[in-house]
């Protein structure tokens, strides 16, 4: 059975990575936000009241990646070498992909997950006025399927 690395009989700790070699690390995470088809069309046409939804979501996602160790208590601050956030449109969804790269001693999965999550939350925030129903609820809107689709540790 695998053991937890951040918790032992003495309590909680940040894992020691000083002995590890710095190698290329990459992680890719994906997730989707379900939206009304009319909202998707507004975003594509650039006609949302709050501005450019996609550019704002990209910026938010990149910022989230950079802030990961401040928000997840036991994550190491990692010198990132690159972050890419992209989007693919479906009829009733937007799929976000966040790729994070670093040359360091520990992986960047949490950073990729944070980036995709905040990008999707930002989309929701920017379109909530048109997604609400008459009672102010969101019967169609949901974020789903956030997961790591690729993790790379280049052995050298």
UniProtKB/Swiss-Prot annotation:
It is an enzyme of class 4 (lyase). This is Probable cyclic pyranopterin monophosphate synthase. It comes from Thermococcus onnurineus (strain NA1). Homohexamer; trimer of dimers. InterPro entries: Mo_CF_biosynth-C_arc (IPR023047), MoaC (IPR023045), MoaC_sf (IPR036522), Mopterin_CF_biosynth-C_dom (IPR002820). Substrate binds at residues 74-76, 110-111. The active site is at 125. The lineage of its organism: Archaea, Methanobacteriati, Methanobacteriota, Thermococci, Thermococcales. Belongs to the MoaC family. One of its GO terms (biological process) is Mo-molybdopterin cofactor biosynthetic process.
């Amino acid at each position: 059975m695998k053991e937890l690395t951040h918790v032992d009989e003495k309590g909680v700790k940040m894992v020691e990575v000083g002995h590890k070699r710095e190698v290329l690390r990459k992680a890719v995470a994906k997730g989707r936000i379900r939206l009304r088809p009319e909202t998707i069309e507004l975003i594509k046409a650039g006609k949302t009241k709050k501005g450019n939804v996609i550019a704002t979501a990209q910026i938010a996602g990149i910022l989230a990646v950079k802030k990961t160790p401040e928000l997840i208590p036991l994550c190491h601050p990692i010198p990132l070498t690159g972050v890419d956030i992209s989007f693919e449109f479906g009829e009733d969804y937007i799929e976000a992909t966040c790729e994070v790269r670093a040359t360091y001693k520990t992986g960047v999965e949490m950073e990729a997950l944070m980036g995709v999550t905040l990008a999707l939350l930002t989309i929701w925030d920017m379109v909530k006025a048109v997604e609400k129903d008459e009672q102010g609820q969101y019967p169609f809107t949901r974020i789903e399927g956030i997961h790591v689709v690729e993790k790379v540790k280049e052995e050298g």
